[in-house]
From Swiss-Prot:
Residues 1-190 are annotated as: Enoyl-CoA hydratase. InterPro entries: 3-OHacyl-CoA_DH_CS, 3-OHacyl-CoA_DH_NAD-bd, 3HC_DH_C, 6-PGluconate_DH-like_C_sf, ClpP/crotonase-like_dom_sf, Enoyl-CoA_hyd/isom_CS, Enoyl-CoA_hydra/iso, FA_oxidation_alpha_subunit. It comes from Vibrio vulnificus (strain YJ016). It catalyses: a (3S)-3-hydroxyacyl-CoA = a (2E)-enoyl-CoA + H2O; a 4-saturated-(3S)-3-hydroxyacyl-CoA = a (3E)-enoyl-CoA + H2O; a (3S)-3-hydroxyacyl-CoA + NAD(+) = a 3-oxoacyl-CoA + NADH + H(+); (3S)-3-hydroxybutanoyl-CoA = (3R)-3-hydroxybutanoyl-CoA. This is Fatty acid oxidation complex subunit alpha. Its EC number is 4.2.1.17, 5.1.2.3, 1.1.1.35.
Amino acid sequence: MSEQKAFNLKIDEQNIAWLGIDVPNEKMNTLQAAFADEMKAIFAQLKDSSGLKGLIVHSLKPDNFVAGADVRMLEACKTAPEAEALARQGQELFQQLSDLPYPVVAAIHGPCLGGGLELALACDFRVCSDDDATRLGLPEVQLGLLPGSGGTQRLPRLIGLLPSLDLILTGKQLRAKKAKKLGVVDACVPQTILLDVAKQFVEKGKKRAKQKVTTKEKLLSGSGLGRKFVFEQAAKKTHEKTRGNYPATVAILQVIQHGLEKGMKQGLELEAKRFGELVMSNESKALRSIFFATTEMKKETGSEAKPSKVGMVGVLGGGLMGAGISHVSVAKAKVPVRIKDVSNDGVLNALKYNYKLFDKQRKRRILSKAQLQSKMLQLSGGTDFTSFNRTDVVIEAVFEDLSLKQQMVADIEANAKPETIFATNTSSLPIHKIAEKAQRPENIVGLHYFSPVEKMPLVEVIPHESTSEETIATVVALAKKQGKTPIVVKDQAGFYVNRILAPYMNESAHILLANEPIDKIDTALLDFGFPVGPITLLDEVGVDIGAKIMPILVAELGARFKGPDVFDVLLNDGRKGRKSGKGFYTYKGKKKEVDKSVYKLLKLTPESKLSDNDIALRCVLPMLNEAVRCLDDGIIRSPRDGDIGAIFGIGFPPFLGGPFRYMDQFGLKELVEKMNQFAEKYGDRFAPCDGLLTRAGEGRRFYDN
């Protein structure tokens, strides 16, 4: 344990104890097993101190309370009982805090998450700042875990069963006012008076009285029948969402129910036991690997060079992508944006799109009316290049047409500063071709966003051979400020995400042409863990977009990207997907149904012959094969980048950890065997690539751990 202490105890003149948390050499406070002895000693001292009026637990960090338990300590656990012991230790410490004979108040400013909230729940009262940085939640489920230090038992007893299930099963984070409304905190006040208000709670001199239970809560969780109904409904809804792929949700329901029926002591025992089991599960290991990867990536700059300052962004094109890019630039990166479109309608649509998103935040009380107006004032636009001479980065989001994009480069070189970076949001065109006629090719880079931009977390940064290191560093820094996770990929057709997606989509078309029903194919991949099935995805992206991308991949990467002739048949029948109201499905508002006339159009007689598992593997194996080729061709820099790209870019099942983690878990020898079986049965497109064969033959893995 470090010599510096994480917990600082002071007793003031009024006999109020102040426990300040300040984890040494860390920006954020996190709870670590190494602090256990220190905490035990402090709680023993507090228990034995006579005449104390109360205790206030607060943070000595300027911007966070406790961001959770340090997830790294779980990696040292080799068995479920070891992980269970960690949970029991946390439970015992928080129980000691709860058992102190005087009022204990948590004064919360900034993130109060996971173990941090469990610490606060063990206090009698909670007071938080109304600052936007204050967030409260139990996000353990997102790591494939459950709250292991009493959270599953204390929260339902504090705020009731239904709101607790919602918070613990989703891992959602509450803003301060919502936390007050739900009863998670007792007061929500300006940060300047936070500690004074905490003191007032101590001065009342009372421990927390038992919660008053509402009639609704009595009916729902107080009676065996009501409780049974709530848990049955919660299990049903959760299974619909997770399709049985996340064991943590099942454990959460079981542990909360057990605690309400058998009492808190037994509830805590089961909480610790299930926590230990979940720590050792493949799902949690995969989800934790994503957490560690994204944490690492936040520190990376993509280049050795220093990024240039970005004071203003220009956006070319007011369509869906341009509107989304302008939104994240203003809302997240907090830089003013100038939009240019060929028509005023295009600019107007982009502004309306932004207003709609900001207004949603106003309705949810995230933004005030004045803040909304202030955000909208950061956006302007027109049909000419006015103000583009002040832009530092221009992001182009026009149609996928090479000569049009080259013209955009020429226009920006003529109308912006010599050092202005031109970032193209192409999804398929090679960056070196877009930069071919540029006067300053070092300023040109690919910046591939995913739709809808304001929701999708990934961006691919694609330098071509002449892109400067400073340009790379600048767009990586900008993407991070926009709230994105950037991965730097090599300039080759399809880049990374679309390149691994193409064989997956092609195989779904092969399966369809073998008479498997459309909804059966989609369901098989949903059950595998994808957020949408491949046929639905094609409709969402647009059949016309797929038809444009595939020939580019075939031309540059070879015949293995040639899919069945489905696109042209659909497009000739006016089926572009959701945007045209019909594709493989028909769309009426939010409802979609399989358009059975597609079968006739494609001369098919739908009949289910394949198992769900075979359908899923047939789609996924070509994707895995292509991911390995991308790694060996230098398209991605590491298996980690490949995993994050696939999860954040196309929704590869997070509980599998990404294509490379999944291959390690599957076993490379077994994977090669399965691919060879499929190659024999369905064709050479399943033949394992050289990189897979070599690694399998040498007994190597993609990851060491």
